[in-house]
A protein has these predicted regions:
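Class I S-adenosyl-L-methionine
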Residues: 1-15, 20-25, 29, 33-49, ...
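Nucleic-acid-processing active sites and adjacent nucleic-acid-binding tracks
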Residues: 83-93
Length: 247
């Protein structure tokens, strides 16, 4: 279950939490020193992450802004209000991506959402890896809705190309309607989708690193699949959310 956003966060920058087998840090992924503290001498078998690629970065769609207006096919659902993403008014920095490859170059499996927006920062422009498609819509009516109809996921290793069909119309989802209704983060992914991908490309008890943890869906997916997640999130508010979701 996804909790409400706290008005005043308990977490502070630099805090590290042990959540069962998982490790969570309120830190800055553009700082190599924070990544070293998070990993604490351990090595991940997989990196699975979703960088904040909306930061002053040209994209082919307009951002969905939270509102109190009624939305949906029959106007029967209130719009989600998202907390302002830290750093969203700053220029996109290459460190958001280069730090992944610098600190996890030993990882055979690296999965990065939204890589099509910074393909020039991927090894050999992403040609050596594979691309996966998450198709969010299933009907023509949904295709005309606000926001992207699909998202791309790049993997460092060559895999069979797959299209994952999981409806996620911002607030509607046949697969997990409760999670979709309670969506708190603008780039939040359905846990059921992350669970399927993580199960397919990692083993039980593997350590999965996510240095852009957001609302914590990767950690929850790891909990459900008997993996360990070492995650980092810059915003103390979302660190509190992650802890509440795990509890």
């Amino acid at each position: 279950e996804v909790p409400e956003l706290p008005k005043e966060p308990k977490a502070k920058l630099g805090d590290i939490y042990q959540l069962g087998e998982h490790r969570l840090m309120c830190g800055d992924s553009t700082k190599e020193s924070d990544i070293i503290k998070l990993m604490n001498g351990q090595k991940a078998e997989m990196v699975f992450t979703d960088p904040p690629y909306g930061m002053f970065l040209e994209t082919d769609y307009s951002k969905i802004k939270g509102s109190e207006k009624s939305i949906g096919f029959k106007g029967n659902k209130k719009g989600n209000k998202y907390n302002k993403i830290l750093g969203d008014n700053e220029d996109f920095t290459d460190l958001l991506i280069s730090n992944i490859f610098k600190n996890f170059k030993y990882c055979k499996e690296i999965f990065i959402w939204g890589s099509d927006y910074f393909v020039d920062l991927l090894p050999n422009y992403g040609k050596d890896g594979s691309w996966f498609v998450w198709n969010k819509r299933s009907s023509e009516a949904q295709q005309k809705g606000i926001g992207n109809c699909f998202e791309l996921l790049w993997s460092k290793k060559k895999h069979k190309r797959i299209v994952y069909n999981f409806e996620w119309f911002g607030f509607l989802s046949k697969d997990d309607p409760k999670e979709a209704r309670n969506r708190l983060h603008p780039s939040m992914k359905p846990t059921i989708l992350l669970t399927k991908i993580i199960q397919s490309y990692s083993e039980k008890n593997n350590l999965i690193a996510d240095i852009y943890l957001g609302s914590g869906s990767t950690l929850i997916a790891c909990e459900k699949t008997n993996r360990k997640c070492f995650g980092m999130e810059l915003d103390p508010i979302y660190v509190d959310v992650i802890i509440k979701r795990w509890e």
